[in-house]
């Protein structure tokens, strides 16, 4: 039996069979033995109502998806009207020129968004040759730097960038008289004031660098590059989602939306500037820009369980990033763990003693869920191994393995379907603005992130939700396509599109 077949099996019926077998065995012993066995059996049935309630609350049927999609579109409009008017920040990227394929020359990118930073260079050859060559290098950031001071962090980054530039070979050519230009992917909350400047709001993702909040991160990097003697200009500051959109659109003009589904999640899309009320005071020329939705903060209408609420209450940011906590890879395994904790507390699903490792927050991770759902063996041997290695359950029963897989599927199904509803909300908002510009033609949603790439069930549930909400005619015009590691290349391409040496600025669409 495959894992899919296992989760299709009626778990309550399986519980009843196990109970009947145990009752049959208990009849052969004395009354004392029978009493002990029956008392151990009774709690096992307690998982059935927990599982039934979980199925119901995580089903995310079409009416729930419709409510979420409509609320997403409404939240987008509120965020575009006024800062602070809704949950969605709707941050203008100030990108008014996207790469077209005409760009030529040598450009660099720096991607900072976690415990490593990545530097890369790309040689562009215009429409005919496109990307001629690329090279990249990844550098691990020591913990003391992540918890140090601003100057030390940016000096460390500039030093790594300087060493990388020094290895520039003959296949990369900087035109005479030009300064090297850099696209800076900075995946932390910033108040972006122009294409090449942004004020850090706060550090996240384990960084606690003092003295940076409230400062322009591009100015910090420029100062560090000067201290290193590195003659380079930052021509574009972007977040990873914006970089992904730019990288995908370089190859396909129909890309209008980019979504990252990995450890965290975010989405951005192309927006007409005249439909952004909060920017009207800037008197921008009619055209397009990219809006960073910061959709992880969305929460309106989400079908939450007691396990979601408990996890949120105990998080470092209670009441915040609810959509992210419901659909992203950081949290899906933890939600499943909390369900299993409750089941273990009220039953002997994992044996007569509570598995101590199961009490550790985040011990069960989303890759574990993925591995268990790919188990196609009759006895779910991979599931048994994970339960043993990760939460310390030795020789988990087949029932325990099946229940674990079904709980995982419930949470993954809800996450994927809600992500799909979010995508539809963005597309429908864009359609309402453009009157036929989205669903009247081919439109591409560029996807990146390990959760989307590596978890087939999640990916399938997401696409099913999009198809259900849009219907066959409209959904057939929407292409959801994977673009791997697009943010780094995208930053270099945005540096090229916004180069001070560009002969002309070309609008996004």
Swiss-Prot record:
Q: Which PROSITE patterns match?
A: HEXOKINASE_1 (PS00378), HEXOKINASE_2 (PS51748)
Where is this protein localized, as stated in its record? Plastid, Chloroplast stroma
Query: Where does the Hexokinase domain lie?
Result: 45-496
Q: GO annotations under biological process?
A: glucose 6-phosphate metabolic process; glucose metabolic process; glycolytic process; intracellular glucose homeostasis
The record's EC number reads 2.7.1.1
GO molecular function list:
ATP binding; D-glucose binding; fructokinase activity; glucokinase activity
Where do the annotations place ADP binding? Answer: 114-116, 263, 450
User: In which pathway does this enzyme or protein participate?
Assistant: Carbohydrate metabolism; hexose metabolism; Carbohydrate degradation; glycolysis; D-glyceraldehyde 3-phosphate and glycerone phosphate from D-glucose: step 1/4
Q: Which domain of life is it from?
A: Eukaryota
Q: Which stretches of sequence are listed as region Hexokinase large subdomain?
A: 239-485
Q: Which UniProt keywords apply?
A: ATP-binding, Chloroplast, Glycolysis, Kinase, Nucleotide-binding, Plastid, Transferase, Transit peptide
* A Pfam family reported for this protein in Swiss-Prot or TrEMBL: Hexokinase_2
Query: Where does the chain bind D-glucose?
Result: 204-205, 239-240, 266, 294, 324
The record's account of tissue expression is: Expressed in roots, leaves, flowers, immature seeds, endosperm and seed coat.
Question: Looking at the UniProt record for this protein, which Gene Ontology cellular component terms does it annotate, in alphabetical order?
Answer: chloroplast stroma; cytosol; mitochondrion
Locate the region Hexokinase small subdomain. Answer: 100-238
User: What induces the gene encoding this protein?
Assistant: Not induced by glucose or fructose treatment in leaves.
Catalytic activity, reaction form: a D-hexose + ATP = a D-hexose 6-phosphate + ADP + H(+); D-fructose + ATP = D-fructose 6-phosphate + ADP + H(+); D-glucose + ATP = D-glucose 6-phosphate + ADP + H(+)
Family membership, please give it: Belongs to the hexokinase family.
Purpose of the protein:
Fructose and glucose phosphorylating enzyme.
Q: What is this protein called?
A: Hexokinase-4, chloroplastic
**What gene codes for this chain?**
HXK4
């Amino acid at each position: 039996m495959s894992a899919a077949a296992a989760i299709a099996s009626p778990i309550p019926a399986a519980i009843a069979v196990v109970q009947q077998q145990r009752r049959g065995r208990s009849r052969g012993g004395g009354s004392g033995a029978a009493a002990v066995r029956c008392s151990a059996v009774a709690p096992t049935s307690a998982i059935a109502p927990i599982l039934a309630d979980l199925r119901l609350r995580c089903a995310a049927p079409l009416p729930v998806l419709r409510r979420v999609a409509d609320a997403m579109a409404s939240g987008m409009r509120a965020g575009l009207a006024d800062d602070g008017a809704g949950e969605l920040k709707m941050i203008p990227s100030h990108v008014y020129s996207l790469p077209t394929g005409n760009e030529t020359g040598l450009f660099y990118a720096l991607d900072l968004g976690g415990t490593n930073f990545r530097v890369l260079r790309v040689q562009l050859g215009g429409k005919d040759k496109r990307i001629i060559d690329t090279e990249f290098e990844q550098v691990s950031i020591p913990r003391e730097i992540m918890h140090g001071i601003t100057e030390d962090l940016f000096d460390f980054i500039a030093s790594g960038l300087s060493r990388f530039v020094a290895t520039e070979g003959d296949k990369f050519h900087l035109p005479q008289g030009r300064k090297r230009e850099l696209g800076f992917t900075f995946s932390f909350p910033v108040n972006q004031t122009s294409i090449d400047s942004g004020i850090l709001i706060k550090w996240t993702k384990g960084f606690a660098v003092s003295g940076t909040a409230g400062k322009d991160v591009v100015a910090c990097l420029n100062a560090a590059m000067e201290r290193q003697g590195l003659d380079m200009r930052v021509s574009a500051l972007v977040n990873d989602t914006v970089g992904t959109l730019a990288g995908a659109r370089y190859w396909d003009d129909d890309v209008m939306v980019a979504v990252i589904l990995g450890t965290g999640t975010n989405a951005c899309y192309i927006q007409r500037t005249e439909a952004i009320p909060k920017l009207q005071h800037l008197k921008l020329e009619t055209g397009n820009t990219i809006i960073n939705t910061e959709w992880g903060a969305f929460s309106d209408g989400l079908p939450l369980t007691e396990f979601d609420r408990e996890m949120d209450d105990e998080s470092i940011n209670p009441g915040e990033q609810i959509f992210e906590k419901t659909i992203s890879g950081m949290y899906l395994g933890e939600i499943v763990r909390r369900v299993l904790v409750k089941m273990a507390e009220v039953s002997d699903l994992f044996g007569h003693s509570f598995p101590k490792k199961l009490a550790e927050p985040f011990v069960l991770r989303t890759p574990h869920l993925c591995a268990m759902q790919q188990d196609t063996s009759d006895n779910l041997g991979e599931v048994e191994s994970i339960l043993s290695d990760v939460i310390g359950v030795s020789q988990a029963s087949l029932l325990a393995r099946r229940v674990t897989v079904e709980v995982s599927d419930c949470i993954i199904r809800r996450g994927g379907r809600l992500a799909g509803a979010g995508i539809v909300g963005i597309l429908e908002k864009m359609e309402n603005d453009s009157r036929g510009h989205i669903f009247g033609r081919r439109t591409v949603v560029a996807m990146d992130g390990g959760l989307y790439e590596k978890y087939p069930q999640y990916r399938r549930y997401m696409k099913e939700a999009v198809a259900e909400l849009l219907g066959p005619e409209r959904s057939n015009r929407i292409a959801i396509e994977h673009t791997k590691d697009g943010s780094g290349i995208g930053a270099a391409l945005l540096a090229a599109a916004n180069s001070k040496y560009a002969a002309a600025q070309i609008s996004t669409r």
